[in-house]
Amino acid sequence: SARALSGFGGAVSTPAIQWYPGHIAKAEQQLKRHLDKVDLIIEVRDARIPLSTGHPHLNRWIHGKHHLLVINRRDMVTPAAWEAWEQWFKAQGQRTVWCDAKSGTGVKQVQQAAIRAGNQLNERRRNRGMRPRPVRALTLGFPNVGKSALINRLVKKKVVASARRAGVTRTLRWVRLGQDLDLLDAPGVLPPRLDDQRAALHLALCDDIGQAAYDGELVAQAFLRLLLGLKSREGAGVVLSILEERYGTPVAGRTADPAFWLEATAERHTSGDKARMAQRLLDDFRRSLLGSIALELPEKVVS
């Protein structure tokens, strides 16, 4: 639930962010057609925003199926952040496997967990007098959370188009992962309406929705507000001095106001072009050049 989130540094005041292009709507229709054919759902989320990248319809889709929750981009947050989330999910009765598809960290554990789930499914088939068969798994998640990069790691060669951009995978395709597991790489799916605008902002910051959906300057300002709210949170990984050293503008006094900070930094770096400066700030965050920053942290773990 969104109540698990904390440390947001005030209200987020950006115009409503909505993004549901035709190819996403089509992807959801394709996905629903294939759900009956799969035994295992491998859900992939983003470690920086593990709640915002959870699809609200997921429980409806995974009903009666094995569900493996993979949190990708582990290397982009602090160990304290992912350990806190691991405990939080455990308290909800949900085991998680953490990995980083780009560096390969934890990918073997994902593979082992998927094969284990497959073995359990085939054991159940045997007990019912049915013959074992390769398990059919579906990777599911928001656009740009790294599903295709993870599949490429799992099969150890590039078989699926993969790029850091929302909506690169447009069609469904099967990939053989060992002799006992077939994987279906599905395009990213989003809810038709982004009702939780705080989550929508996080998706925009992590480049999980198309740039046409939001105003870059306003999202950059909201990002700065978010950092100010998170800086005192243990595990968030916000170090304002990195920002100040990189851009030469202190986050204090008058320039502690995000609009003034963006204006002053644009004067220094982009000839006063605030839109270009906003894009640079967002790109730097997305490439981890501002440190390992978790935009979402669990409120507390109830033991």
Model-derived regions: residue spans:
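Helix-rich effector regions associated with P-loop NTPase G domains
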Residues: 2-41, 48-49, 54-68, 74, ...
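Short beta-strand/turn micro-motifs composed of small residues
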Residues: 45, 71, 141
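A structural signal for isolated positions on well-ordered beta-strands in alpha/beta enzyme cores
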Residues: 68-69, 138
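Conserved active-site beta-strand-loop modules that form the wall/rim of enzyme catalytic pockets
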Residues: 101, 151, 181-184
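Short, structured loop/turn "capping" segments at alpha-beta junctions
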Residues: 121-125, 152, 158-164, 231-235
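Short coil/loop residues immediately preceding or within conserved phosphate-binding loops
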Residues: 132-135, 157, 172
